[in-house]
Amino acid sequence: MSSGGLLLLLGLLTLWEVLTPVSSKDRPNFCKLPAETGRCNAKIPRFYYNPRQHQCIEFLYGGCGGNANNFKTIKECESTCAA
């Protein structure tokens, strides 16, 4: 294969890696945790990944405590946990 062909193949493989969504085996374990509002009483809109529905869902975060399955934006949730 020519060097141009190898460069094209390398470029395509790199692009595929970047555009491929997170697979369940690569998903962090905290994505499996339930939504947890925390100990405080604020009502801050946040997102968590629901593994049964395979999507990010909005919930109201209390402002303190909780767990790592808690994202400020749906985009952040999807890029971290959604397949």
Curated annotation (Swiss-Prot):
According to the entry, every stretch annotated as the BPTI/Kunitz inhibitor domain falls at 31-81
Instruction: List cystine links.
Output: C31-C81, C40-C64, C56-C77
**Origin superkingdom:** Eukaryota
Pfam families attached here?
Kunitz_BPTI
Q: Subcellular localization, per the record?
A: Secreted
Listed A to Z, the keywords are: Disulfide bond, Protease inhibitor, Secreted, Serine protease inhibitor, Signal
- One Gene Ontology CC term in the entry: extracellular region
Per the UniProt record, the site (Reactive bond for chymotrypsin) maps to N41, A42
Q: What is its main location?
A: secreted
Q: Which family does it belong to?
A: Belongs to the venom Kunitz-type family.
Q: Which purpose does this protein serve, as stated in its record?
A: Serine protease inhibitor. Does not inhibit plasmin, and does not reduce blood loss in the mouse tail vein blood loss model.
- Protein name (record): Kunitz-type serine protease inhibitor textilinin-3
**Protein species of origin:** Pseudonaja textilis textilis
The organism's taxonomic lineage, starting at the top: Eukaryota, Metazoa, Chordata, Craniata, Vertebrata
